Amino acid sequence: MMQNYNYKYYEPLEQMIAVRHQYMSKIIKKITNLNIYEYLKNKKILDIGCGTGEFLKNYHDLNNQCLGIDIQHNFKFKNKIGFTLKNTDFKNFIKNNKKKFDIIFIFEFLEHLSFSDREFLFKNLFKLLNRNSLIFISTLNKNMISKFLAIDVAEKYLKLLPKNTHDDKYFLKPSEIQNLANNNKLHLIDVSGMTYNPLFKSFKLSKIDLVNYFISLRN
């Protein structure tokens, strides 16, 4: 079960569960003409930076084989057949991994990586993928508005996250992810923004990608 940590700091991430699912549904429908429940059957799914494992667990319940990795050991669930959460660094995982996946989640993770770690990840993503696989990413845009809302408001004023969770020098513009993808045999499907409503503690898809946004890729 979970080890000791302040659960409130995972709440903003778990408030994203519905909008992540909504975004994935939109993309899967766009490229396969299937709904997400038809498509997500017997798939092999990797969640890089899986947090508590809450989001990934939903897709194991749809009869997929799910593996989540995170450098922190704050998992909510015990491992069982078809569902594994590993406390490991993503570099070590990639170096030792022999499996391939149909879907990879990289949610709220890239903005915590150095530039060299980011390049390492993208250089190796292609090796992790089966044919016709999908990658779903969410992260923070790089601009003054994003810095103000994600750091000054969320961390310092509202205290939704611990101070120093983010460093805006690691925030990424969508074009930066697209360049990393293009340089590593991956192709852009879509970029969509999402906005947060603090009154309802919920996110929704938006045409505005100034702060949070999704990107989907394929090989």
Where on the chain are the PLM-derived regions?
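Conserved class I S-adenosyl-L-methionine
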Residues: 136-158
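Acceptor-substrate binding/catalytic loop of class I
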Residues: 159-176
